[in-house]
């Protein structure tokens, strides 16, 4: 190369590294030595894994020597370094979307490079939201080629593939992922439960809610028994998910653990049934916490959020002031920082991320115009933080809030979704009740089930009654009987059958008033209700026989 050409390439800095190292494996040994010496003049460690790879695989000594000189010049690893580990480390940096690995920050597209011996270097544009995932998958793939038995590299590849799927813009065809290729879940499930747990651990540590949900879905399909709560390098990701500050993740984790029907207690087993019970009467209501310097600002934000169907916690100037209200809420779906002093906002966001109950909550920052640009640049790659000027129209801010929640946590819990979780949780609790599971004891859900019995209607109400009929507590049987008497027609008959089932299992726990009501129905109720009441009366096994007077009375007619 002429000195001028060399100077131009070196002046490109980090932009030159990936194109050059992409060509390395596919050019002649003479060209390899030339490229290696050129890369050595570009002071970026990004090239070290590729140089180490070539040093380990080349059979040409001058090439190997040139690689080692370049590595030493760049401050890299000595000869014989773990090349697979170097690729994995660089893949991790791409997965984290480090700024120094983003060629065109703030742009819609990045460049991907490939090399064809016939035509040379080829570049293709790729949307920025999926660029880092593409590079992470490419590098993790090479790491796995060198060391196939590395579960951490495989978990990184699976995580990157899930993130690619999550971040792909609607309607976009990714040039690195063929349209007919299997979806990310296929590879996650095929990789096994251990890899799934590693992916979940990554999601929890980075507060990546969409990734956490996909990881749990994969684990549920592959893991069983103690593998669900096994220790993974000092972590138990699925158990940690039970306290993750997102309702969907908690529900998903509890459902997965309940399906396993554990026969020995584990750390966190006491949380499973209460979470499932909470899902039964969980509404689609979203909860927001607003921190503002004054009540006027708070009221303005609160009004907007309430019009978006949020429930908003009481006013607080700081997160600490809101701590009691946050602790009592089932979850916090949004945190709003409204007009905080510019230098206070980053500290506030750090505090939120360090507070377990809200660590994964999306954060909407509403700020003054003079600090807007600096804050937006600071958080532009964080999908859990959105920065907007507080002077914007309400409709614009509301749209930004909705987009933030969609991106960070999968959107608001819809009415249909809440109903689906309730039905799945009921099915899980019923299975636990039928099996008599002593580790996940459904009796711990009694209070919530009794409350839900009064709230729900139709088939779901009868499903709740079925579980209560399998709980040997007087309050369960009494609640069922009270519900039956408050109903009529077919529903009353169905609920009385549940009371009968409870009495057959556990004996009578009813109060005298209930027995009188039953006897009244036997004597005077419509045929269907009278027959159901008669069966219940028999199941109660009362010492004072209520049947003889009925026989004598009916004999007179």
Predicted feature residues:
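Output/docking surface of receiver
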Residues: 317, 366-406
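Conserved phosphotransfer microenvironments
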Residues: 332-360, 366-375
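Acidic, metal-coordinating helix/loop segments flanking the phosphotransfer/catalytic sites
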Residues: 315-334, 342
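Conserved acidic segment of CheY-like receiver
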Residues: 284-297, 301-306, 335
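TPR alpha-solenoid repeat register
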Residues: 152-153
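Structural detector for internal amphipathic alpha-helices that build alpha-solenoid repeat scaffolds
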Residues: 2-14, 19-25, 31-44, 53, ...
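Alpha-solenoid HEAT/Armadillo-like helical repeat scaffolds in large eukaryotic proteins
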Residues: 1, 8, 19-27, 50-58, ...
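Short coil/linker segments at helix-helix boundaries
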Residues: 82-84, 89-139, 163-197, 229-238, ...
């Amino acid at each position: 190369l002429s000195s001028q050409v060399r100077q131009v390439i070196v002046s490109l800095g980090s932009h030159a590294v990936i194109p050059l190292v992409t060509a390395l494996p596919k050019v002649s040994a003479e060209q390899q030595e030339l490229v290696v010496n050129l890369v050595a003049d570009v002071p970026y460690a990004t090239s070290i894994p590729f140089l180490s790879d070539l040093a380990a695989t080349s059979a040409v000594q001058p090439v190997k020597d040139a690689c080692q000189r370049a590595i030493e010049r760049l401050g890299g690893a000595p000869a014989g370094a773990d090349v697979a580990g170097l690729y994995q480390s660089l893949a991790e940096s791409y997965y984290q979307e480090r700024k120094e690995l983003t060629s065109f920050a703030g742009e819609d597209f990045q460049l991907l490079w490939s090399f064809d011996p016939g035509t040379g270097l080829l570049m293709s544009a790729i949307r920025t939201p999926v660029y880092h995932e593409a590079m992470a998958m490419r590098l993790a793939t090479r790491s796995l080629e060198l060391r196939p038995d590395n579960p951490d590299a495989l978990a990184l590849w699976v995580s990157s593939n899930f993130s690619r799927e999550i971040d792909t813009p609607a309607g976009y065809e990714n040039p690195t992922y063929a349209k007919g290729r299997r979806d990310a879940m296929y590879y996650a499930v095929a990789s096994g439960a251990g890899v799934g747990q590693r992916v979940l651990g990554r999601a929890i540590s980075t507060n990546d809610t969409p990734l956490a949900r996909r990881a749990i879905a994969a684990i549920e399909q592959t893991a069983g028994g103690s593998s669900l709560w096994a220790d993974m390098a000092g972590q138990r990701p699925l158990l940690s998910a039970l306290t993750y500050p997102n309702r969907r993740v908690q529900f998903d984790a509890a459902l997965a653990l309940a399906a396993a029907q554990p026969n020995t207690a584990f750390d966190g087993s006491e949380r499973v049934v209460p979470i499932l019970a909470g899902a039964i009467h969980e509404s689609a209501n979203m909860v927001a916490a607003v921190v503002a310097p004054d009540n006027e600002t708070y009221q303005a934000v609160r009004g907007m959020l309430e019009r978006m169907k949020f429930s908003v916690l009481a006013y607080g100037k700081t997160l600490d002031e809101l701590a009691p209200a946050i602790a009592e809420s089932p979850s916090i779906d949004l945190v709003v920082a409204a007009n905080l002093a510019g230098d206070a906002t980053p500290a506030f966001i750090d505090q939120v991320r360090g507070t377990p109950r809200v660590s994964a909550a999306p954060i909407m920052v509403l700020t003054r115009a003079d600090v807007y640009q600096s804050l937006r640049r600071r958080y532009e790659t964080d999908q859990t933080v959105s920065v907007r000027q507080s002077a914007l129209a309400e409709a614009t801010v509301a749209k930004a809030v909705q987009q933030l929640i969609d991106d960070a946590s999968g959107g608001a819990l819809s009415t249909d979704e809440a109903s689906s979780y309730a039905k799945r949780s009921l099915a899980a609790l019923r299975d636990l009740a039928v099996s008599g599971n002593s580790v996940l004891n459904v009796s711990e859900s009694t209070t919530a089930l009794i409350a839900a019995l009064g709230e729900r209607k139709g088939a779901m109400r009868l499903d709740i009654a079925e579980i209560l009929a399998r709980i040997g507590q007087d309050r369960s049987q009494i609640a069922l009987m009270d519900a039956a008497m408050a109903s009529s027609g077919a529903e009353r008959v169905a609920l009385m059958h549940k009371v009968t089932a409870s009495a057959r299992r556990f004996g009578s726990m009813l109060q005298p008033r209930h027995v009188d009501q039953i006897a009244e129905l036997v004597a005077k109720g419509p045929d269907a209700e009278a027959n159901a009441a008669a069966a219940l009366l028999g199941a109660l096994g009362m010492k004072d026989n209520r049947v003889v007077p009925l026989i004598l009375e009916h004999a007179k007619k």
